[in-house]
Amino acid sequence: QKWATERKVEDKKEGYDFPIIRYAEVLLNYAEAVYERDDKISNTDLNISLNLVRLRVNPAMTPLTNELITQNAGMDMRTEIRRERTIELFNEGFRLDDLKRWKTAETEMPMDIVGIQWKGTEYEKVWANCPYETNAEGCIIIEKGRKWEEKNYLFPLPSDQLQLNPNLQQNPGWE
């Protein structure tokens, strides 16, 4: 459950002076950190982290295990850990930072953002004149033509800081 205060903001004194982190994020961070450190993760570590997040949503869901990954060609543990994080933290503002940390933004960011599958569904009949472009799978394209440059992995250093310290060098691509 997402958490928020019950206090009203009418007095303009609402705010928090401490970080807020969901327990699910802690568990996902743990699973990712263990895997990235060791290039593997035990089923025990999966059961005390990522699988708790999965099973909270659907107790009947098959737990993620090393055996499941081995039995299914095309699956790999790193991708599954990242996929679970993407799903659980959807729309919470983590995605861009995750893509930067994983250094996958150059492949993910230029991809089209797609919405619902429209063609071949009941919506195609109800909304006969869909004003949006669709892709080959019949999904509405929300945004396309996005670009990503290597320099976007780092922010530019503020010019006043560069002037204060001549030993600082501007981040690559921001010169």
Model-identified regions with their sequence ranges:
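Acidic/polar-rich alpha-helix caps and helix-coil junctions
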Residues: 1-175
